[in-house]
Structure formats: structure tokens, C-alpha cells
Swiss-Prot record:
Role this protein plays: Forms part of the ribosomal stalk which helps the ribosome interact with GTP-bound translation factors.
Organism: Methylobacillus flagellatus (strain ATCC 51484 / DSM 6875 / VKM B-1610 / KT)
InterPro entries: Ribosomal_uL11, Ribosomal_uL11_bac-typ, Ribosomal_uL11_C, Ribosomal_uL11_C_sf, Ribosomal_uL11_CS, Ribosomal_uL11_N, Ribosomal_uL11_N_sf
Gene Ontology CC annotation, any one: cytosolic large ribosomal subunit
Protein name: Large ribosomal subunit protein uL11
Subunit record text: Part of the ribosomal stalk of the 50S ribosomal subunit. Interacts with L10 and the large rRNA to form the base of the stalk. L10 forms an elongated spine to which L12 dimers bind in a sequential fashion forming a multimeric L10(L12)X complex.
GO molecular function, a single term: structural constituent of ribosome
Family: Belongs to the universal ribosomal protein uL11 family.
Keyword rRNA-binding attached: yes
PTM remark: One or more lysine residues are methylated.
UniProt key word RNA-binding: yes
Keywords: Methylation, Ribonucleoprotein, Ribosomal protein, RNA-binding, rRNA-binding
Length: 143
């Protein structure tokens, strides 16, 4: 018989930097999960990723105090800002443009995000990324 699920916890944790301090500790502690076990497993799983890159993670907590977790791809906005070499988007995105990315950069981001996007093909995924970039005040060349 399958284990009884008692809850799901959604967090964004920097790659390789999970520790028992908030938000990780309180979120897992409320469900009675072993915080250090999660931190070690998460840090080991994100070892090959760029340190500090925020990684969304969904933790499934079971009644026997065990857990599993699924890591998602980094948020598109983070990847877009990194490609455009800017710190934040425009406060008035359709009026003030703060940066540019090329179609090749948008394709690279779309390939990275592909597992989490609902797009049918690469071109649709690129258009999704381009839309996110435009809403941040970043111009996308060639889309």
C-alpha cells in the first residue's frame, strides 16, 4: 500500500545552500520532517548547478515522517535577467526598455525551462520566454 501523504511544501531555495534556517526549517519542522536530511539531500542534488541560483522544489511529506522532493527548473525571470545582464526588470515595461536578449539566448532559456513549460515545441517555448522578457521590459531580438 502507498504511504499516506500529509502535505506538499513548495519552496524556492538557492542551489547548494539549503540550511535549517527559515524558510526551510520552519516549513519542514511543522510537518515533523528531518530538516538536516532534506538539506543534505537537496545540496547533494544541486551540487552540479550554479551556486545560489534559486531552485523551486516541491516536497511531499508522508505520515511516517519521510519525504520525497522534486526539483523544478530555475524561474524564467532569473534566467532572463542573467542573459540580459541586469539586476531587475523595468518599473514601466512597455515604455522603458532596460535590456536586450537575442533569439539564441531565448532558445537557450527555453531549452533549460522545457521540462516545466507546457509548450508543444521549441518555437512555442521561445515565444513564452519572449513574452516573459517583454513583461519585464527586456527587448527580444528576432522573435
Amino acid at each position: 500500500m502507498a504511504k499516506k501523504v500529509i502535505g506538499y511544501i513548495k519552496l524556492q531555495i538557492p542551489a547548494g545552500k539549503a540550511n535549517p534556517s527559515p524558510p526551510v526549517g520552519p516549513a519542514l519542522g511543522q510537518r515533523g520532517l528531518n530538516i538536516m536530511e532534506f538539506c543534505k539531500a537537496f545540496n547533494a542534488a544541486t551540487q552540479s548547478m550554479e551556486p545560489g541560483l534559486p531552485i523551486p522544489v516541491v516536497i511531499t511529506a508522508f505520515a511516517d515522517k519521510s519525504f520525497t522532493f522534486v526539483m523544478k527548473t530555475p524561474p524564467a525571470t532569473i534566467l532572463i535577467k542573467k542573459a540580459a545582464k541586469i539586476d531587475k526588470g523595468s518599473p514601466r515595461p512597455h515604455t522603458d526598455k532596460v535590456g536586450k536578449i537575442t533569439r539564441a539566448q531565448a532558445e537557450e532559456i527555453a531549452k533549460t525551462k522545457a521540462p516545466d513549460l507546457t509548450a508543444a515545441d521549441l518555437d512555442a517555448a521561445v515565444r513564452t520566454i519572449a513574452g516573459s522578457a517583454r513583461s519585464m521590459g527586456i527587448e527580444v531580438e528576432g522573435v
